[in-house]
């Protein structure tokens, strides 16, 4: 009877939302795993590397490798232990919020706190911890050697903050990052091991309250040709760090304040404001493609002009027909360029209808979170033809919806990999999910 109901549900869903896709779920063996943002990449060895996060005071997030050829998952390590903080009773290294960046046979990434204090509906760096525990020691920069399968701790982020955003100049071996909650912009030279702190990027960042709050940029766009690094603030300013400079500069001739993106209060903690949500470098065109999270608009950023060109809206077809934005308050991070260097992949939302009415969700939230239930859609965009395609909603074989999806990697098998919530036997965990794209 249950199987009949599942088949009926999928039939109705496909009729309402389009053809749709069925996702395969994995079990990495981490039942307490919580939501991951970014935290997944495909490496040159053809394997998928990912982090499953944790919000516990007692253990950290965990690193895994999915081996495509063997179709098996290998556990690589606990973030807290990798950072040398096992049994120290400090707030654990619960998360990694960044992609893996490959350089000379190593994957570079960083850590973030997962245990917070909730204040006025917002996640705050924990200053109040249980008796016997200590405060968060700070995020670490880490390297994983693909040949020896060993980790290296490169040290702490500036001001003992967590690392929220990180990218890499792979031509010169320089990491760029933004910390949390204040938001210090920093660089780390892999060869010389020199860390430089260039100061806060947006006032008090996410440590502020009320009018002093500023949501931080989640994507640092690095131009490998010049070595320049770009990021935004919620006011819509674009900042540039030029290789060798002593400070960051604001671009005078371009910004993200576009009418198509909407109107935002930069002190609003429930949106990304005018920040870009995710960016990716296109090696052939030597430009960035990016998505503005709250509007879902695709744009092209040529740093040499500089110029932002708004292209098309990448939200799902049901969202466009409804005229509504995604229900994830920051918009989605799952945006990347495929191996063919012409196809953009985007995991976005789509409205859910009940009795013919759209489930609206909450009007306002105070942090990055889902305001209500929505479907997951896979959208592809052919850069050469400006060809948009919504592949329809994604469901698990049992009819459930993947939720809290803010990561993406396209494997050497041309399948899409992400991290999403999975419910099994009444328990919810975040785990690896595979989506086969219908061509």
Where are these regions (language model features)?
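Beta-strand-rich domains and repeat architectures in extracellular enzymes and scaffolds
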Residues: 27-61
